[in-house]
């Protein structure tokens, strides 16, 4: 089992964790249908940037 040789300070621990924060997903509203979707993704209706790109 691995055992540390020297104790890491709170400062060094927190500096390491400074990049671990989570961000919320960027959500957009479609111009045509008003539906929310992920950026650069087609909506569930098949719209992308106000145009119908997938026929269902």
From Swiss-Prot:
Composition bias, Basic residues: 7-16
GO cellular component terms attached to this protein's record: cytosolic large ribosomal subunit
GO molecular function: structural constituent of ribosome
Transmembrane segments: none
Keyword Ribosomal protein among record annotations: yes
Gene Ontology biological-process annotations: translation
Family: Belongs to the bacterial ribosomal protein bL32 family.
Protein name: Large ribosomal subunit protein bL32
Region span, Disordered: 1-37
Keywords, sorted A to Z: Ribonucleoprotein, Ribosomal protein
Tagged with keyword Ribosomal protein: yes
């Amino acid at each position: 089992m691995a055992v540390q040789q020297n104790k890491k300070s709170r400062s060094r621990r927190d500096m390491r964790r400074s990049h671990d924060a989570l961000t919320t997903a960027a959500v957009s509203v479609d111009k045509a249908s008003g539906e929310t979707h992920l950026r650069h993704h087609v909506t569930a209706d098949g719209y992308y940037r106000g145009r119908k790109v997938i026929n269902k």
